[in-house]
Every structure is written in C-alpha cells, then in structure tokens.
C-alpha cells in the first residue's frame, strides 16, 4: 500500500500540491489525470520519494519514504520519468541492465531476454540508446524498470510511470497497457501513471485521480469520475462522453 497524507509543495509562491491525501491499496492500475500544470508529475515525484514535500508525508507499506534506504526502496518501486536522456553512448542492452544496480547479482540471460521480448526491445539490443526514437526509448526504459523489479522478493512491487505513452504509436500503447495488466494480475505489480490520454485511462485504469491546481478533485472508478460535467469543468473543452460498447467504459469524444 502507498499513502499520502496532507502533501503540500510550493515553488515560487505557487502550490503544486495543495493538501493532497490519497491511499492506493494496490492490485490496480491508477491513472493521474489533469490539465497542464495541475501538479500530476509533482505528486508522482513525491509518491516515489524523489521530491520531499514542504509538509505532509508519503508512506510505503506504512513506513515513511524518508526512512527507507535508497537500495531497499529501489527493490520495491521503479520510476519512469518524462525525460530519460543519456549523455554517453550506452547500448540498449547496457541501459536495460542498469536496472540491476540495486541488486548484488546480474540477471540470468534468459530473464533479460524475456523482459526485452515483453517490451519489444530485442531488435534494439545493440543500438546506441541516444540514437533511438522517443517511443523506442520509452520501451527501453520500461524494460529497465522491469529488470529492476523482476526478483520475486520483496513483493509486491510498484511501477510509477510519468506519461509513458507520450511517444508511443497506437500499437505500442495497447501493448504497454496489456502488459501492465498482465503484471498486475500475475506478478503482484501495482501501477501508478500520469497520462494525458483520457480514453487510454478510461479503457485500462482501475482507478482515476483527477487533479486541478494542485488539488485532487476526484478519485474513483473511471465511470464515476470521467463524467461529461466533470471533464468539461476541468478542461474547458467541448466534449461528449459516451459509453464504449465493448467494455462499458467512458468514451470521450471532442465535439466539432
């Protein structure tokens, strides 16, 4: 379980998180949504321990994040940031193997190959990471996170992903979320991601957190949160919310 209690963080006089309290029990995919500048990435950084709030605290398994050692925390949770640029000419395989840093031993070759296959990275193995497209880099970074968390213990695991589909084509967006669901159901993974694509969130997330101006304004199941009234008020866009006939999730359509 991950919990946040009364998180406040300000920068240059502006509150990026404003008294945020949340509890994620686990066993689900959580999507954090909101307009630009709502505080989504700031909240994600606080939930992962990369950013200390001005007040309030985050806990993992009821233990404050600031009481975890860096190594032990890295065995429980892994984080994909929006930008993962590298200055040095590492190969894709070397980047993926960096996920083993918190552990004393390297992956078995078959485990690394399995993870690269899951993330569709096999053909990229010997490429210079810096020469990859944005979408290819996102797939490689996901593979690195899975290498980091692939050990069966400790368990459960948490994946935090900041806009993981921003550069992916539609095939790899679908592949990513199918894989995340598989990890949740089969390997005791928990997923928390920041997204801008409302329909991806509606289709694949179990829980939606809506943010506006540093505050959480809604938190619940997609069909309860992604309503036409709520989204029109939040985004100021002309939209229609329908029901997806395939799975009865909300389907958000931009009006002409």
Curated annotation (Swiss-Prot):
Its main location: membrane. GO terms for molecular function: ATP binding; ATP hydrolysis activity. GO terms for cellular component: plasma membrane. SMART domains: AAA. Residues 2-238 form the ABC transporter domain. ATP binds at residues 34-41. InterPro entries: AAA+_ATPase, ABC_transporter-like_ATP-bd, ABC_transporter-like_CS, P-loop_NTPase. It is an enzyme of class 7 (translocase). PROSITE patterns: ABC_TRANSPORTER_1, ABC_TRANSPORTER_2, HMUV. The keyword Secreted does not apply. CDD domains: ABC_Iron-Siderophores_B12_Hemin. Its EC number is 7.6.2.-. It is a peripheral membrane protein. It is found in: Cell inner membrane. Part of the ABC transporter complex HmuTUV involved in hemin import. Responsible for energy coupling to the transport system. Belongs to the ABC transporter superfamily. Heme (hemin) importer (TC 3.A.1.14.5) family. NCBIfam families: PRK13548.1. The complex is composed of two ATP-binding proteins (HmuV), two transmembrane proteins (HmuU) and a solute-binding protein (HmuT). This is Hemin import ATP-binding protein HmuV.
